[in-house]
Amino acid sequence: MINVQNVSKTFILHQQNGVRLPVLNRASLTVNAGECVVLHGHSGSGKSTLLRSLYANYLPDEGQIQIKHGDEWVDLVTAPARKVVEIRKTTVGWVSQFLRVIPRISALEVVMQPLLDTGVPREACAAKAARLLTRLNVPERLWHLAPSTFSGGEQQRVNIARGFIVDYPILLLDEPTASLDAKNSAAVVELIREAKTRGAAIVGIFHDEAVRNDVADRLHPMGASS
């Protein structure tokens, strides 16, 4: 589902006289369907850069990032913008602890929107969104309110529900359980396990050792030549 070959990325710090900061050096990674691979390494080892490159947020300087999109393999390094948009809609999902939404949109709408965008009827989208919000312990009294009024933890759980609303073949998880209590972390772990069971290829960053041990099929060490 994911095949990364010899990806390198150097950031140029223009505000610091063009200082070059190498982050990835010929990084390679393969992830199969139904597998959760956790990127593991010290701060600055390139975990976030690789994860964001898998979502085409960063463009590597060299190498290939091949992902299975329907019946075809697509290299995200060379894919046109319209293809990246298409891939994000149906193939690659991103789940993080941060929620960025239009202030007046209700939590239920925020969660169901990605599924609506795939053409699923509104009633079915709303029902699935409600199930996810319930599982993630977001009180029903909040569903029709704007998440901008919520606590940080409530916003985080809304964002996790949004990330899991579509059954993406590939899931990228950026610290989804950071700051969550044990009960809500367990709910997220269960969602990850279910995604694995249906065959999703998952790449994640988890600093919570207990969660990492629960979900990881293997750790992928990151470093100077990851």
Curated annotation (Swiss-Prot):
One Pfam short name: ABC_tran
Keyword RNA-binding attributed: no
Keywords noted in UniProt: ATP-binding, Nucleotide-binding, Transferase
Chain segments annotated as transmembrane: none
Binding site for ATP: 41-48
Domain named ABC transporter: residues: 2-226
Enzyme Commission number: 2.7.8.37
Gene Ontology BP, a term: organic phosphonate metabolic process
Entry's Gene Ontology molecular function annotations: alpha-D-ribose 1-methylphosphonate 5-triphosphate synthase activity; ATP binding; ATP hydrolysis activity
GO cellular component terms listed in the entry, alphabetical order: alpha-D-ribose 1-methylphosphonate 5-triphosphate synthase complex; carbon phosphorus lyase complex
Protein origin, superkingdom: Bacteria
Catalytic activity: methylphosphonate + ATP = alpha-D-ribose 1-methylphosphonate 5-triphosphate + adenine
Protein's job: Together with PhnG, PhnH and PhnI is required for the transfer of the ribose triphosphate moiety from ATP to methyl phosphonate.
Protein name, entry field: Alpha-D-ribose 1-methylphosphonate 5-triphosphate synthase subunit PhnL
